[in-house]
Design a protein with these regions (language model features):
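Soluble or luminal CAZymes and related metallo-dependent hydrolases
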Residues: 21, 77, 189
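Flexible, active-site-adjacent loop/turn segments at secondary-structure boundaries
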Residues: 12, 77, 104, 176, ...
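Catalytic alpha/beta core domains of metabolic enzymes, predominantly
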Residues: 32-38, 45-156
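Charge-dense, low-complexity intrinsically disordered segments
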Residues: 16, 115, 184-187
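C-terminal alpha-helical cap/extension of soluble enzyme domains
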Residues: 110, 121-206
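Active-site beta->alpha loop and helix N-cap motifs at the rims of alpha/beta catalytic domains
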Residues: 1-52
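Short, electropositive alpha-helical surface patch
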Residues: 1-4, 58-64, 169-172
Length: 206
């Protein structure tokens, strides 16, 4: 299909793999695909995978496959990990998994963010990114807004909250139907969430 950029989780059925085991796993993926255009973004999400993709692994893989291992999405929420990888592997395109880290990550050379809440608040996240380079005073104001938005949303189960917001603002009840085991956000919680974020003047549009 022509898609060469891939966000790749570690294999997480067996827990506590060694660094060498993870190196072998990603090496197998790259060697078997055997395509010079392949670009892999390591996906660190230990809360779900149970595996931390640490700086030692990133250093080894980026040295072994400099043209294939090109980025890292850090959904751990651990700023120390994000910062350490940017310092030790500056050639890696870093994408924190929360917009709360956007401005300070850009300060250290990050490429941007890949954030779930960006699905419902894309415009403000984009504006914050652009203002960082063009209008620092504006970027500070916008960063506070996206911080407040994220903080409000993550008080609830994330997917349920995001789909509830899309249902409400698009007036489309189809968004309240989630695949099990996920469930729709209770109406009272959705009402409270809307009251929290309405003053932030966000938009579903990018």
């Amino acid at each position: 299909l022509g898609y060469f950029h891939h966000l790749v989780l570690p294999p997480f059925y067996y827990k506590n793999p060694s660094v060498n085991g993870l190196v072998n796993n990603y090496s197998e993926i790259i060697n078997r695909i055997d395509n010079k255009h392949l670009k892999i973004y390591l996906y660190n999400f230990p809360q779900l995978s149970g595996i931390q993709l640490g700086v030692d692994l990133v250093e080894i893989l980026s040295e072994k496959f400099p043209k294939n291992i090109v980025g890292y999405k850090d959904s751990s929420g651990d700023w120390d990990n994000t910062s350490q990888i940017m310092e030790k592997c500056p050639q890696i395109n870093m994408f924190p998994g929360s917009e709360i880290f956007l401005s300070k990550a850009l300060e250290k050379g990050a490429a941007g963010v890949i954030t779930g809440t960006g699905n419902v608040n894309p415009g403000m996240v984009k504006q914050t990114y652009e203002a960082f380079y063009n209008d620092k005073k504006k970027s500070i104001i916008l960063q506070k807004k996206i911080d407040d938005f994220r903080t409000a949303v993550q008080k609830y189960p994330l997917i349920s909250a995001l789909k509830g917001l899309i249902e409400y603002y698009r007036k489309d009840e189809g968004w309240q139907y989630l695949r099990p085991p996920l469930t729709a956000l209770p109406k009272a919680d959705l009402k409270n969430l809307i009251q929290s974020i309405d003053p932030l003047e966000f938009s579903l549009k990018s």
